[in-house]
Amino acid sequence: MKTLGTYFQNSETEPLKYGEVNLINPPRQRLRGEEKLTGIEAFPVFNGFCGTDFELMKMGRAGNLNAKFPEGEKRLINGHESVVWVPSENRFAIVLIRGGDSCDPTRYTEDETYFEYGCDGADGLFCDKNYFNPQMLLHLPEKYEGLKKLPLSLAKKLVFSDPYACAVFQHERMEDIGMAQNFRVEKAKRKCSDAEAMEYARESTFDRVVIFGLGTTGLFIGDQIRRNHENAKILFVGRSSEETAKVKFAKEVVKADYLCTDSMSEAETAENIIKKIGGRSTVFVGVSGTNVEHRVAFEHKVLGCNGIYNSFSLGPKITFDTMPFGFENHVIFASINFTQAHMEKAIEILSESRFDEIVELIDKEEFIADPIYAYENKIYSKAAPLKTAVVWNKNYMEMEK
């Protein structure tokens, strides 16, 4: 069986290519203990571009993709953010990306293995059709069951199901760690029971939140914190002007403040952050992908006592002085993943959100004519929108809605 799509390969000149691809359909399992199931056919309808795709393309250019290919293959169909049509079930679905011989793909441990459609060991969604484990084709909210055409506004919202699920998990982890980290402080301060102290700590963990970097990841983490902690003080930090559309949107939707650091030194950045939030941060989320974030948090002391540093960036190396790190009781953690429950929650939230407002489209014909050029000059350029997506199969789309 063949399909048309874009795929990664190890090639200095063509790490990403559009063309005919042989489809494979090995049995896959969703979770440890479950039966491996042969995939059922699905047609990708609306696809989103993710920074992971761009990084995989760079790996292909450097010849480093062998570990990512499906077994026995020398290419990987890319894409892991999509709304698909499942003809055998006559419905739209969101593909749960992560599965495998794992009790919980979020708590991946050494004795477990997992795959990710479009990223690691399993072909993805930038193709005319593919096969997916039927247990991993998640339903849209009940009010949308029975749709035969996908409204454009809904498609734009649901294309964020993967990254927003990450944000749901990020909030959950910060809350878990924050309660464990801070309940004894609250207990000593308030002379209350352990259970009461836990609830106080659940909120005080998010008293002063710094989100260093304003892309979709930072935006969604901020949104999750605001939805769960109405009194949290949230500050986005970035280099974009406060007058840009994305900054205005983030401030309005998340009810957050913003600091533009374009002309500031690191020391000035730290000073202004502390001034803006009224003290040192209780949570510092690094999502800028730069080394500046950890220096601002640790060297310049933006992260306060008992503070949590959430590293969501891929690439930077975190360094810190062990003396203040130890005496100020800091915690550093990183957890870039999610489970089915997180994605199902994300789908429900997104369907009623305004996040369709930050998605812009690239024409499919323009993209497939030269996908590398599109990635480098349209989708991930400095002038790129917060999110780019493509209508992959217009036959299942309602473009007027």
Can you describe what each PLM-predicted range is?
Residues 1-78, 186, 190, 201, ...:
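Short N-terminal strand-loop motif that marks the start
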Residues 29-48, 60-107, 123-124, 136, ...:
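Glycine-rich beta-strand-centered segment in the early N-terminal region that forms part
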Residues 38, 178, 264, 268-272, ...:
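C-terminal hydrophobic helical "lid"/dimerization subdomain
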Residues 80, 99-208:
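NAD(P)H dinucleotide-binding glycine-rich loop of Rossmann-like/cofactor-binding domains
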Residues 179-212, 226-232, 244-331:
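Glycine-rich cofactor phosphate-binding loops and adjacent beta1-alpha1 units
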Residues 216-217, 242:
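Hydrophobic/small residue at the entry helix of a nucleotide-binding pocket
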Residues 238-243, 315, 338:
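Residues in the short beta-alpha loop(s) of Rossmann-like NAD(P)-binding domains
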Residues 307-312, 320-360:
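Rossmann-fold dehydrogenase core element
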